C-alpha cells in the first residue's frame, strides 16, 4: 500500500495464488504467472471463493514472460518470486534454479520500480540464504532494506527441519 493507491505486483511461479490473493486483498493490481493452466484455473477459483476479482492471469513460462515485460518497458512496484528447483514451462521449457535464477533476477531488477519490493523464496537445499542474498545483490545492487534467512519447519520435538531460504528487499 505504501507504493500508492494501486501498486502493481507481479507474482511469478504463482501456483494456487496465496500471495496473489493477499496482494489483491491489500489493494494491489496483481499479475499472476504460472506455467500450468490447471493451477492457474485453481488460483482463479480461489480468488472467486475469496470474493476478490481483478487479477491478471497469465499461463506462461515465467522467464519468457519477464523477458517480454522488460522489452515492453513495464515496471512493477512489487515482485514475488517463488521458483521451483526444477520445472517445465507450458511449451516444455526447462527451468533449473541454479542455471536460470541469475537471468530471472536480472530481468526482475529491470522490472522493479525504484521504491519497489522483492520477495524471494527458494526451496532448494543447494542454495543458502547467503548465496540467495549475493545473487539478489548482484542483480539489484544494494537494498534500502533487506531481510533474509532460512525457512524451516519445527517438528513436535522442537527440531528445525530445513525447507529453503527467503530474501526480502526494498529499494
Task: Name these PLM-found stretches.
Residues 36-80:
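S-adenosyl-L-methionine
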Residues 112-113:
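Helix-to-beta-strand junctions that scaffold the AdoMet/dcAdoMet cofactor pocket
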Residues 6-15:
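Conserved class I S-adenosyl-L-methionine
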Residues 117-171:
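C-terminal catalytic and target-recognition region of SAM-dependent MTase-like enzymes
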Residues 29-34:
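Conserved SAM-binding motif I beta-strand of class I
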Residues 39, 59, 77-107:
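Mobile active-site "lid"/loop adjacent to the S-adenosyl-L-methionine
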Residues 24-25:
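Gly/Ala-rich phosphate-binding loop of Rossmann-like dinucleotide-binding domains
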Amino acid at each position: 500500500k505504501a507504493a500508492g493507491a494501486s501498486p502493481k505486483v507481479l507474482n511469478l511461479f504463482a501456483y494456487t495464488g496465496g500471495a496473489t490473493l493477499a496482494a489483491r486483498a491489500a489493494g494491489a493490481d496483481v499479475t499472476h504467472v504460472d506455467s500450468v493452466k490447471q493451477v492457474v484455473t485453481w488460483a482463479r477459483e480461489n480468488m472467486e471463493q475469496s470474493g476478490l476479482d481483478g487479477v491478471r492471469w497469465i499461463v506462461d513460462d515465467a522467464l519468457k514472460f519477464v523477458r517480454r515485460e522488460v522489452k515492453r518497458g513495464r515496471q512493477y512496484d512489487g515482485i514475488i518470486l517463488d521458483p521451483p528447483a526444477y520445472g517445465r514451462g507450458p511449451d516444455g521449457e526447462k527451468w533449473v534454479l541454479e542455471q536460470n535464477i541469475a537471468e530471472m533476477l536480472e530481468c526482475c531488477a529491470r522490472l522493479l520500480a525504484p521504491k519497489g519490493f522483492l520477495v524471494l523464496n527458494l526451496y532448494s537445499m543447494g542454495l543458502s540464504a547467503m548465496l540467495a542474498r549475493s545473487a539478489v545483490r548482484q542483480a539489484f545492487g544494494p537494498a534500502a532494506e533487506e531481510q533474509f534467512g532460512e525457512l524451516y519447519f519445527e517438528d513436535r520435538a522442537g527440531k528445525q527441519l530445513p525447507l529453503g531460504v527467503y530474501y526480502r528487499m526494498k529499494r
